[in-house]
Amino acid sequence: MNWSEVFHDITNRHDFKEMHDFLDKEYSTKTVYPDKENIYQAFDLTPFDKVKVVIIGQDPYHGPKQAHGLAFSVQPEGKFPPSLRNMYKELEDDIGCKRTVSHLQDWAREGVLLLNTVLTVRKGEAASHRNIGWEVFTDEIIKAVSEYRDHVVFILWGKPAQQKERLIDTSKHDVIKSVHPSPLSAYRGFFGSKPYSRANTYLEAHGETPIDWCGEEAQRG
């Protein structure tokens, strides 16, 4: 199974013509993030048969030079968002390495599917592309990973992500849940939750190579 087959199966069962027509108009008349060629970057960087971890986000960042198709990740020249800073703070406390880069492309190449539930957004208008069809598409992606892959770690931060647990076969996958890393909630249970080491412990217990969360640029403790 690969992403092309997954996409083919999804589009056979759901009609996304209205969504694509809407997006064509949006991209031609407004500023939309990410750039069109980066909408599906999460799937380009993480092949289906390499998925080990799924981190579920919500909408892309809606500021300039930020969104590039990976949940929580920011373009190298983009402004560092607070949620990502908190993710890195927890990473340092959990594993002992200090990341300084704003993008998560190395995580994606390691097998971490960084999946937003909505894949596009209008500049400066959070949630502007919700309920146009993306949620149907990404729910099917989650179900496909759950059905056709084994021993994947699903990391669900915040209530919207945790609502996706119903799509996951928890008898053969691990689910790690906490509040969102946003500054509004991080101190209510995200800090100290150790998602990175917990994910690796599960992967190693099932014969998988652990994720290198630190990356080459990180300072390791």
Curated annotation (Swiss-Prot):
Catalytic site: D59
A Pfam family of this chain: UDG
Catalytic activity: Hydrolyzes single-stranded DNA or mismatched double-stranded DNA and polynucleotides, releasing free uracil
GO CC, any one term: cytoplasm
SUPFAM superfamilies reported in the protein's UniProt record: Uracil-DNA glycosylase-like
Cellular compartments annotated: Cytoplasm
PROSITE patterns: U_DNA_GLYCOSYLASE (PS00130)
Enzyme class: hydrolase
Gene3D superfamilies the UniProt entry points to: Uracil-DNA glycosylase-like domain (3.40.470.10)
Keyword field contains Secreted: no
GO molecular function: uracil DNA N-glycosylase activity
Domain of life per record: Bacteria
Cysteine pairs bridged by disulfides in the record: none
Gene Ontology process terms (BP): base-excision repair, AP site formation via deaminated base removal
EC number assigned by the record: 3.2.2.27
SMART domains: UDG (SM00986), UreE_C (SM00987)
InterPro entries: UDG_fam1 (IPR002043), Ura-DNA_Glyclase_AS (IPR018085), Uracil-DNA_glycosylase-like (IPR005122), Uracil-DNA_glycosylase-like_sf (IPR036895)
Record keywords: Cytoplasm, DNA damage, DNA repair, Hydrolase
PANTHER family: URACIL-DNA GLYCOSYLASE
NCBIfam families reported for this sequence: PRK05254.1-1, PRK05254.1-2, PRK05254.1-4, PRK05254.1-5, ung
Record family assignment: Belongs to the uracil-DNA glycosylase (UDG) superfamily. UNG family.
Functional note: Excises uracil residues from the DNA which can arise as a result of misincorporation of dUMP residues by DNA polymerase or due to deamination of cytosine.
Protein name: Uracil-DNA glycosylase
Gene: ung
